[in-house]
Amino acid sequence: MSNKFFTFLIMGVAASGKTTIAEKLAEKINSFLIEGDDYHTKENIYKMSSGVPLNDSDRYEWLIKIKNEILKRNKKQNLVVTCSALKEKYRTLLGPQNFNLVYLKVSKKTAHQRIRSRQGHFMPDSLVDSQFAILEEPQKSIVLDESLNTNEMVKKLVSIYKSTYQ
């Protein structure tokens, strides 16, 4: 009998809560966390830190690195992956749709407020609008909006995991 492993891809604009949710979820379901921000090139981090939005070609190498990490691990262990994945073509590039796509939906106002309060992150508040401008909301996903608190979101995802995997 072959092992079946589960992958959550958590997407959304900057400051939607991807890392916060992913860290808690990965711990709850004993999964390996792939934090998309860790795969950005130095050039991309510099560009974003300077207030310049990334374009499709800037994102390509980053998305390929995340995809390769997923492919390296998804046959061996459960995964929780964070990636803004703002466009459908980015999500398609990440690989076959054999992951559970989670869209963290927040308003521009909430994203701006959260990003202003966060410390030590390269993404400035000035780039929030550019992320919303290119966002293509997914047609098929688990949508969690800002009306839920972190614990409620994680609880929902754990429930989906248990009902699907166990």
Question: Across the structure, where does each feature detected by a protein language model lie?
Answer:
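Conserved phosphate-donor/acceptor-positioning beta-strand/loop module used by diverse small-molecule
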Residues: 95-114
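Conserved substrate/cofactor phosphate-moiety recognition/catalytic segment
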Residues: 23-65
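Conserved lysine of the Walker
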Residues: 18
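Hydrophobic anchor at the beta1->P-loop junction of P-loop NTPases
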Residues: 10
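Small-molecule kinase domains that catalyze NTP-dependent phosphoryl transfer to phosphate-bearing small molecules
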Residues: 117-160
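Walker A (P-loop) phosphate-binding loop of P-loop NTPases
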Residues: 15
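Loop/turn-to-beta-strand initiation segments
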Residues: 76-79
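Phosphate-binding P-loop
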Residues: 1-5
